[in-house]
């Protein structure tokens, strides 16, 4: 691996870590204030399309395959043994991504519901993990038509994390707090404002991603994108598809 590639990976890991820390420290419930309100400028969601013939059946088949993919990994030790890695295991998170980077790389070229990029777990009081769902990804340049071919956009809403302003040296603290300025919880959402603040603007931090929770019985929760369903949507481990400019 070249020094440049290593620096890129370390920088992207830093960005992802900031996402997690900000999500864990942001206020929950009530109105959207401070960082949570600013998050609206950093998330792009595909629009729901009208339901087409065959969409429901296709989505149901993906959910069934996701269940099959998850079955061996109810014991998280098996996931670790099979090459899944916990992203930022020592940082408290509502949900932990166990990511298989080989699967993620393959997902930029094909869609196989039996090989998700990430397994989604909640941490138990005893230190173990309970399997909740999976995450599928695609490259950042994929069109919405391509996403629709993978999972119908009448059923699922794919999302990207966008408009990241990297803080200039010495301004680390402004990623956090009740009114953050930089990062994916920050008030800065445009290149112009970022450059005026001395930052570096990154239009797309991660590739396309979508969560599936096959064990849910309510269809709305199977394809949940928010915390109202008890799931966390702060994705941070979809390394494939990252775009730096």
Show where each model-derived region lies.
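Bacterial N-terminal signal peptides that target proteins for export
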Residues: 2-10
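Intrinsically disordered, low-complexity segments enriched in polar/charged small residues
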Residues: 9-12, 241
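Bacterial N-terminal signal peptides
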Residues: 11-20
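Bacterial Sec-dependent signal peptides at the C-terminal "C-region" and cleavage site
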Residues: 21-33
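Primary mode marks residue(s) on the alpha4-beta5-alpha5 output face of response regulator receiver
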Residues: 30-245
């Amino acid at each position: 691996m070249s020094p440049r590639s290593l620096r890129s990976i370390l920088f992207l890991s830093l960005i992802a870590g900031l996402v997690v820390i900000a999500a864990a420290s942001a206020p929950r419930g009530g109105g959207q204030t401070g960082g949570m309100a600013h998050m609206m400028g950093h998330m792009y969601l595909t629009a729901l399309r009208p339901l087409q013939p065959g969409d429901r059946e296709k989505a149901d088949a993906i959910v069934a395959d996701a269940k099959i993919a998850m079955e061996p990994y109810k014991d998280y030790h098996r996931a670790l043994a099979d090459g899944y890695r916990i992203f930022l295991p020592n940082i408290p998170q509502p949900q932990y991504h166990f990511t298989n980077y080989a699967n993620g790389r393959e997902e930029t070229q094909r869609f196989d519901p039996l090989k998700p990029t990430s397994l989604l777990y909640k941490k138990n009081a005893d230190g173990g993990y309970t399997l909740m769902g999976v995450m599928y990804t695609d490259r950042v340049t994929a069109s919405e038509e391509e996403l629709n071919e993978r999972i119908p956009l009448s059923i699922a809403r794919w999302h990207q994390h966008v408009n990241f302003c990297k803080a200039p040296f010495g301004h680390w603290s402004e990623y956090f707090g009740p009114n953050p300025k930089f990062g994916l919880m920050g008030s800065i959402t445009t290149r112009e404002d970022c450059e005026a603040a001395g930052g570096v603007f990154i239009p797309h931090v991660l590739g396309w991603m979508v969560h599936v929770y096959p064990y849910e019985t309510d269809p709305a929760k199977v394809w949940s994108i928010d915390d109202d369903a008890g799931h966390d949507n702060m994705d941070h481990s979809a390394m494939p598809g990252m775009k730096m400019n």
